Every structure is written in C-alpha cells, then in structure tokens.
Amino acid sequence: MIDPKLFIKILNKYSNFITGVPDSLLKNLLSEIDGNFRGKHIISTNEGSSIGLAIGSYLSSRKPSVVYMQNAGLGNAINPLISLADKNVYSIPMVLIIGWRGEVLSNAKQIKDEPQHVSQGKNTINLIKNLNISYKIISGKTKNIEYVLKTLFLKSLKINKPCALVVRKNTFKKLFSKKTQKKKFVLSREKAIEKIITSIPKNSIVVSTT
C-alpha cells in the first residue's frame, strides 16, 4: 500500500493548495494532510466549489492546485471543469484525486458497493475520458508513486489542463501519526444527531443526504 506521507511529500513539491470533499476511500490520505501538507487546505462544501477555489489559487500563485473528491462528486465538478478550467476557456492546470467507489476491476468485475455507486462506478472512467481529462489509476499495488504523481503534475502544467488520479479501494495505508491524533469533541456524531432529532417539531418534513 502507498504511504500517505510519501504521497504528501510529492504534493508539497508541486502544489501549495488542496481542497475538496472528503471520501472514505481517501481517508488515510486526508487524515495526514493537516499535519504534513505545508500549503493551505480547505474542506469545501461541494466539488464544484472546490474546482472554483483551485482555479482562484492557481491564478494567484501559478502553482497547480489539488482537488480531492469521491467519483460521485464528478457531476458537481463538470460545470466549472468545462466552463472555466477547460483549455478552450482559461486553461487551468490542476490535479484531481478521485476515490473510485463501485470500482471495476481489470477482469471487468465490479466490486460490491452501495446501490448509489453501482452505475457511477461503471461510468467513472468513461466520464473522465469524455471530459478529455488525462488520468492514471492507482491502487495499493502501484509501484513508484513518486514518478506517477510527478508525471501527472508535469503533464497538467505542460498542457495547461486538469489531470486526474483515480484511486482504487485500499490504496493508502493507515498511519498513526502524532500530528493527526483524533480531536476530542464535546458531542459525538450520534449524540449530535440525537439532539437535532429531539428538537425538531412533530410532523416536520426532514430532508437529509450523505
């Protein structure tokens, strides 16, 4: 498996800004970013906003940004990718790190996942191709990740377009860094939800999402 600290070391060399929407497949990488990435890190509200922030950062620093997301968030990212970052518009280099939920294996079999990830998983690579974005697929077996990531950054800068790194399940190893110790909050997630539920008036309509 890939060491997140090694991965972030490469990010530090080529980028000074990371933003995105957290994904469970990327959690071992993301848990190390705050303690080891030297640039700015912003957790965004949605993938489209992330692309916008990445564009703004590049225009001010001339260094390509990194945007992370789950493949389900590609739909939200499409508009700014093709209406702003595209080579026919402002031609903005950046590296997308995309967690591949519902991934399809090399033997064409699909890994079992939640129902909402089935079609998305099957269509992820075709969607990236249709956006005319160069990409690499990595897994826990990927060798020489330094070269893979360096090549992707340099290509993005050369062609002045976004490039993507598609991440399979179990790619990054879990570390127990002192810099990334869990923060102690007064309320757990479950207790917070319980408080919200008990405060909602009866017969209220509640809309929620993942």
Where are these regions (language model features)?
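Thiamine diphosphate
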Residues: M1-K129, I133, I137-K158, C163-T210
